[in-house]
Amino acid sequence: MASRWQNMGTSVRRRSLQHQEQLEDSKELQPVVSHQETSVGALGSLCRQFQRRLPLRAVNLNLRAGPSWKRLETPEPGQQGLQAAARSAKSALGAVSQRIQESCQSGTKWLVETQVKARRRKRGAQKGSGSPTHSLSQKSTRLSGAAPAHSAADPWEKEHHRLSVRMGSHAHPLRRSRREAAFRSPYSSTEPLCSPSESDSDLEPVGAGIQHLQKLSQELDEAIMAEERKQALSDRQGFILKDVYASP
């Protein structure tokens, strides 16, 4: 009996000690949990304030263009050299043809501008040469027709008519000298700077060069196609031989 009572006392003591330890642990954990709750609450309030103040904006991903995919199949060295030569030849031919086309366009544009300028000068010269003679003839007819009618009326008109008859062709020397100088200047010539035959002769080698380049590019394409056909036939024969040797 005494031993049983002793065992019961030790068990009760152990239970009381365990209970005290649990209480101490719970007391220590309570401030940590409360501190975490307060920190979470402060962060939540800050997030709410920022959500209210800062508006949402569109996100710029700054995505660049995708990678340039290359061929996974490695061509043979002979094909690599042929393809590189074809690419370089095509690029050179394209650059040369572009330059020739630009020069042709600039030449045709210059020819059109010169022709238009020449026509304008011709029209201006025709207008300038036709209008003064017409006005002078009208004035002379008016004076000749009006003089006999008013010959006995006004002596001043008679004197003016006499002076005009005496002056004759020297009535307006300054205007005529200016007009003659304008017609003698090289800028008033109505002929174009270059004749159509010269322009055609300048454009003939350009056209021949373009045709030659087109012919070269066509021959190069045909050679490339023939080489590709030969390569395809050789590959096919190789596959057939492999199948024959592999079959029992």
Curated annotation (Swiss-Prot):
Instruction: Tell me the GO BP annotations in alphabetical order.
Output: cell division
In which tissues has expression of this protein been reported?
Expressed in thymus (at protein level). Detected in spleen, colon, ovary and small intestines.
Protein's UniProt keywords contain Nucleus: yes
Q: Name one Pfam family in it.
A: RCS1
Indicate which residues form the motif D-box 2: 53-56
Record PTM Phosphoserine, positions in chain: S11, S16, S129, S131, S199, S201
Keyword annotations from UniProtKB, A to Z? Cell cycle, Cell division, Mitosis, Nucleus, Phosphoprotein, Repeat, Ubl conjugation
Note the InterPro entries from the entry. RCS1 (IPR009932)
* Region feature (Disordered): 1-32, 117-205
What superkingdom does the record give? Eukaryota
Compartments, record wording: Nucleus; Nucleus, Nucleolus
Q: What is known of its domains?
A: The N-terminal destruction box 2 (D-box 2) is required for APC/C ubiquitination and proteasomal degradation.
Question: Could you give the subunit structure recorded for this chain?
Answer: Isoform 1 and isoform 2 interact with PICALM; this interaction may target PICALM to the nucleus. During mitosis, associates with HDAC2 and MTA2 subunits of the chromatin-remodeling NuRD complex; this association is strongest at prometaphase and decreases as the cell progresses through metaphase and anaphase.
| Cross-referenced PANTHER family | PICALM INTERACTING MITOTIC REGULATOR PIMREG, PROTEIN PIMREG
> What's this protein's function?
During mitosis, may play a role in the control of metaphase-to-anaphase transition.
Protein name, please? Protein PIMREG
